[in-house]
Amino acid sequence: MKDFLKYTCASLLGTFLGLLLLGSIGLGGLVLLIALAASSSKDSGPQVKDKSVLVLDLSLNITDSKPIRSPSAAIQDVLSDDPGNAVTLRTVLDSIESAKKDPKIVGIYLEGSSDSSSSGFANLKEVRSALQSFRDAKKPIFAYQMDWNERDYYLGSVANTIAVNPYGSLEINGFSSQAMFFTGALEKYGLGVQVTRVGKYKSAVEPFLLTKMSPENRQQTQKLLGDMWGEYLTTVGPNRKVTVGQLQAVADNGGTLMADEALKSKLVDKVVYFDEIAAELKKLTGTDRENKSFKQISLKNYARIAEDKKSTLANKKNQIAVLYAEGEIVDGEGGPTEVGGDRIAQEMRKIREDDDVKAVVLRVNSPGGSATAAEVIGREVMLTGKKKPVIVSMGNLAASGGYWISMGSNRIFAEPNTITGSIGVFGMLFNAEKLAANNGLTWDVVKTARFADINTVSRPKNPQELANIQRIVDRIYDRFITKVADSRKLPKNKVQEIAQGRVWSGTAAKQLGLVDEIGGLEDAVAEAAKQAKLGDNWQLEEYPKRRSFEEQILARLSGVSVLKPAAKLDPLTAEVKKMQEELAAIESMNDPQGIYVRLPFNLRID
């Protein structure tokens, strides 16, 4: 309650001060104030000291696109010690690449934290490749953590020196995916569910019908986890000079090693306290006079410097547009964390008609969603591809509707651990008949045609109505696989075999012909430049343009911290939050026909 009041008061205070400022000095004065702040920002911005170490916080949540911050949230960022832990993939990649060439940067420190990152493994794969390139440039990487988990260790294993606290541990216990089923709860509260679907592996409807995984869903999930776990082992092993068998043995025999056991197994290089690793970094950088520690700069601060350097070298006439499609695909404009069909289609049209944009990279990180919205976007992708190269870069997941919007491009890149496929269609129909009856509610209807009230939630659909909806689902599925066959130049009968709603890893998708290349966002950008014959003479522009004028103002502000960072969630609260996220997915189901092309609900891999 105390933290709630602090954040609420801070939000109200920020709003009040903003209004007071505007009322006192007027709009012109405010603009002048902003201009002065902008002109002085170069002097007050971050600086890199000679022989500094770039610090990458392993708890950062690496996303594709910039997070949208509400005004109140942005004010909280200013007042808080914690400005948020989200950072874009391109920010991380560009910073590491700049640091590799920067004579003032002598190494990278991967800083562990008690907070765990929620970054997807496909994004981590590309960051890891960038770190490996940094190491290959003969610049050292140090990594330290109290307790190493698999996600952090995936990056940490690339380091020249991996250290763990004497009382710490290292976890390598394999991947798991645990699904939540709502069937019992829906029955308890009187909510009815009916489904129509095509594809025996299209398991998105299972949480609402079953109480456990179907054999088909278990089979596909096991294969997917096996592919991703295999990629993990073959990636981590070589840097540590341990075999896949040795790593698997760790996972099969408890999965958690104490510090001394991790050292004995050659999975870490040192068992030390933080002050000891800091002393080692001081030997590399010398002592910073201000903070008495090693000379350092955080990745977020360094990114600001790297961005300023890039903007001065930009070629405005030769642009490669990176359009982000991140989140649930929904009909209409969509919210800030959704892929709105109309909004993204409009962005693609704008890019297509911009003569300065010579090529497009569509970055997809979506489980799918509305079939209608997916087709709206897919059409614009296809039209743009006829005018200029469109390259798709699949992120952590590009499944079902996410694949639909990708397949019309000129070339598709995916990481080995991208989750894709799920070529299937379903309809999900809720009714509140029992819930209403239990609470004394009734309905009556007057209609002019037999199917006039087919969209009502007052009763279940009758057999004729279900047959009509199933017919629509069947037709959309047939169109889906036909589009896949045409765009991927595959026989339709082969597409029918590999579709059925089944999810695939990027590696498997490449073997099946669903993607063209194994690679990340940087590879896709390079391919776009190659197809557009731009050489090195181009500038990258990101879409949609998300940062508002108001946010730019707030980002310039600095002040004394009056708030504490948000506390880490306890396990029970974290589990409740997961359940809320599962249920929130239902709110995004707004297809006008009630037909969806979507991955299994909130597939989680831990």
Language model features with spans:
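Short acidic-hydrophobic, aromatic-tinged amphipathic segments that line or gate anion-handling sites
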Residues: 163-164, 268-274, 414, 515-521
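C-terminal structured domain segments across diverse proteins
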Residues: 329-330, 334-588, 604-606
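Surface-exposed aromatic
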Residues: 112-116, 247-250, 503
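Intrinsically disordered, low-complexity segments enriched in small/flexible residues
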Residues: 1-84, 90-92, 166, 176-259, ...
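Short, contiguous alpha-helical
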Residues: 262
